[in-house]
């Protein structure tokens, strides 16, 4: 294969390291020249040591400050021609939109819709502007990858894409890194919430369910791992912790070990996910997953077979699904864990995602 110059546009080190390092490793192994546009982070050295060139980029991941966004477009307009890539891979809303606007169809850009986040969950001025920007920018996009059918259907229905798209199984899961482990022994049931502490992630439903279940089953333990994103919801977590309903363990770089210690991973998100990586990694480890009925989550969880689904925003229904798990026999719990692993092996192997990107590199 001819050696190519490839530019990645991302909004955080974790975006590439947690979900795309296998792709980057393979591209480096094949001898391609890689440029990574990322915000400053001490961990960027990981990619520098691989031989990638880091382009420090100021990007406000969640803010809606027009001046900062204009500065980002201006930066991309200057930087992209300087790199002069054969192909651009972008992830998340701002790199997708502003990267495509800046390159203006002069460069082949592959946009990955990793999930719409809070942007399109309710109609607002911000969502209307984002939709308009997507309409303008994605027309200039060479290819669009979707991670779930719900996002794809929305973009097609709204006329944001025509036929320049394909489906991916989320970001995929590294099956070697997330090896199958038997469920923990003992009489205690341990449940794990992994995500930012905020309304969108359904933290209030998790707290409600934790209280209901802990009162009925005192041998239950509910853990919360993630950043404090909204202080008002962190106050609810702290109060629940005082009552003994939950334990907050903060953001964990060793989250794999915590998944192994628990029986269930719970994702009560209200929407905007791609295909949730926490569910893929938990299921691959053999953990039962319980999630809300949203796009992406419903692709991972087969209700009653690999886990349970509950009505989005309904803490009482979440508690009912948790109780279903508790009442299973040890053999039934183990079978559900194995079924989850098998589903990830068959449908969400990260090698599928890597191959899709390598195919685009070969064609460019």
Task: Show where each model-derived region lies.
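Short hydrophobic beta-strand element within catalytic cores of glycosyltransferases
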Residues: 288-291
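A short, well-ordered alpha-helix in the C-terminal region of glycosyltransferases
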Residues: 317, 324, 331-347, 353-359
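Short His-centered aromatic/hydrophobic patch
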Residues: 90-96, 113
